[in-house]
């Protein structure tokens, strides 16, 4: 079969389409893996008292909008910082452990548990020295690998029960 000078070989076109499809899939997988790595680094930073105060909030964009945190705090990055500092003070050894990470587009949903020891004031509770372990879920929205929105749900009833119930 002869082809004219500018005519495209159908086999070459098919191969180019396959390559472009592969590149697109690889790019999508790469960006999903990048977000997974960002979230893992976020948890590692949150869990490390030696670096968290200097690095944790770098994962969040200045335009951050938060949901599911105490209503008396602003729903922006400053309000979020206030709440996290309160957590770190009340539970200096607090750790977050992600059990599931689900990613779609620019959103990451994490199912996790928090664990720690109550060593400082938390809401109306004086330090009890008690250990706690509570479940939670968070949805992050990203732009340029920075978190721009965060929805949070933590089992605060269980936390309160664990801190106040007498053994």
Cite the ranges covered by each PLM segment.
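C-terminal and inter-domain tail/linker signature
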Residues: 2-167
